[in-house]
Amino acid sequence: MFDLVLRNGLVCDGTGAKAELGSVAVEGTRIAAVGRDLGPGRREIDASGLVIAPGFIDPHTHYDAQLTWDGLATPSLEHGVTTVIPGNCSLTLAPLRAEHREFLGAAFRQIEEMPKSAFDAGLRWTWQTFGEYRASIEPKLGINNAPLVGHSLLRLYVLGLASRDRASTPDETRALADCLRACLDEGALGMSTSFCDIDHEFRPVPCRLATMGELDALCTVLGERGRPLQVLPEFWDADLFCTRIDQMAELSIRHQIPITFSPLFESRAMPGLVGRVLERLSRQAARGARLQAQMQTRPIDMTFDLRGANAVFSSMPGWMGVLMSGPDATRKAFADPATRARLAAETDTAPMPLALVFSLEKTRLSAATGKASSEVGRSLGELAAERGIHPAEVLMD
């Protein structure tokens, strides 16, 4: 007798084969049989009129913090995702020494666009090692979790805050390799690294200070275990992206490890990039490199506010200077006619960062207080047309 039988559903097995009516039997945590005439189950579910299919695996998430208070990884589970892979882009919440919690929290919130109020309300730091982090979230999990360990966290754990300023010494490189081994022993699926992330102070994240020699030493450990490496390349520039592919191909071949790049997406700001990247991946695959790119399947949207510097304005020095001056100074600058005109003009001429196709006119107000609360849901373009001013001035108001 099976533990569970899902009967009479439209079975899509995930292979691309034609969907057929049938049943699926489960024993313990594994599928035991798929077919039309299966034996009885201790529990049976009538799936008539429904689809029985494998859950999606989401290979690029940042649920590291959310899983500490939401074991279902809402809303992913609601959309058919049954396995998440957090810890991408060199960022995880472990291993982490207590004295570095404030730094990591600020950096994590900046990069993942998380409100400090939500982060602080939900997160209770009770761990230092990767295993302790895993143990703290395991009882709450209602979704399969296969986390990577972040290269930046390994460096922060071994080098401390010096990891933000320099490469590792030979002794530190060996300690980093030992730390990675421990994390893999404690449940990490693999490792992630980044060549482009910046922290809350707009400085490179720690892994960007690593040498290729350090990365090679860590890939040696991944090769010992047959574990993957996730890489965040300079995805907005085809030349830089292809250079990273060539570098990572050497590591993949040398250590016989799979390496995945994310994200890869098409944008009007960088025509032809996807084709060049896929051609370079194919060329390196022919040499024996195990490389895959994760293609973005939906538009990227961004949420930002004016309480501090953010990625949207990172290519606009005038805006960055004002936003980093503090709330009072920002309000004063926004009220000055000359500054308003200069900032508005800058939004018309500055290149967008990260190959974003960004339009102030189409930007919508999602939250506001006071008089502006009545404008929530409307675009800056609509409001600018009504007031006869530049959309950037609406934003400043």
PLM-predicted stretches and their roles:
Residues 62-65, 89-92, 235, 265-267:
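Acidic, glycine-rich active-site loops and adjacent beta-strand->loop/helix elements
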Residues 9, 24, 29, 49, ...:
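Divalent metal-coordination and catalytic microenvironments
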Residues 69-190, 222-224:
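Divalent-metal coordination cores built from histidine and acidic residues
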Residues 51-75:
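Di-metal (Zn2+ and/or Mg2+/Mn2+) metal-binding site signature of metallo-dependent hydrolases
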Residues 1-2, 39-42, 48, 52-54, ...:
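Short coil/turn connectors at secondary-structure junctions
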Residues 133, 137, 141-142, 148-161, ...:
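Active-site neighborhoods of metal-dependent hydrolases
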Residues 53-60, 85-88, 232, 262:
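Active-site neighborhood of phospho(di)ester-bond hydrolases with catalytic His/Asp-centered motifs
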Residues 2-4, 11-55, 70:
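Histidine-rich, glycine-flanked metal-binding segment
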